Amino acid sequence: MKRRDFLKLAGLTSAVVATGGLMSMDKLLAQAPVVGSTKLETGMQFVGSHAKVYFTKKIDAKHLIMLYNLINESIYGKVAIKLHTGEKHGPNILPRDMVQALQAQIPNSTIVETNTLYQGDRYTTEGHLETLKVNGWTFCPVDIMDADGTVELPVRGGKHFKTVSMGKNIVNYDSMLVLTHFKGHAMGGFGGSMKNIAIGCADGRIGKAQVHGVDKDNLPADWNVWPAKEALMENMAESAKATIDYFGKHIVYINVLRRMSVDCDCAGVIAAEPTIPDIGILASTDILAIDQASVDLVYAEMNNMDLVERIESRHGLHQLTAMRELKMGNDKYELISVD
């Protein structure tokens, strides 16, 4: 399937324009969560386990590095930075200067990616390398992990998969930083840390077809016959769990909530213009907590109509349910502001 058909079928070109005034960050933080999670106030007596999610409303290199330094205790050795590097000239991808500043602070680190399932500029390794140059990802090594093959990683406790096919080079790394541009997604409803590794570490031919539940050699032309939304979320969770199980304690997560289009960065220049204001940066060692906190902050924002519609129309909240069922993290979290 060609990229333009993939995006068209996924409904990437439509958006609902939200109206209303901006909400102050203090009010926003006070209102979250609103979708059934538990945000613990600082100073509360904690009962049972909870995760720490660090937050800043300042989206710049200094604060990105600050948050990383709060969660990086377990990072060692050869470090993979899992980043969505985007289609050519994508207007919403993370700023290169921010990523470059952070990468320079992480010894022995490499940006990692995989090729795409759809036939676009990142479908082949050759095209992918050219796209990386166009988008400015030239300041450090970038490893297209499936360029030379695949590897099967086991899924512990999965009900859909026993293994998921990943880019072969993932096993060359000791640790992983999942650096995510949080935004909408055509199929998943939203793209957070879980989506970043669930689809982003799966290889472009076998693994991504597995996660989407389709035949790699015969991608359905009709969007309506692709797997049920809930099944996709569960497949994504199991794929992400395979990566998490592989790295163990040596994987951490950062979500950057800026330029949050309803469309993924795979949409490139045709992505809908964001209507929700930028919110900030989150960091955690817990994948469920950081994605739950990100969703909570989006729901608490007044100008959220198009992004919330995208999440709910794709049953995106089932991503969180699927992670809970697989015991991938904690949806009870303490949101700790560093500002």
Where in this protein do the model-derived segments appear?
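Extended, low-polarity segments enriched in aliphatic/aromatic residues
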Residues: L40-D339
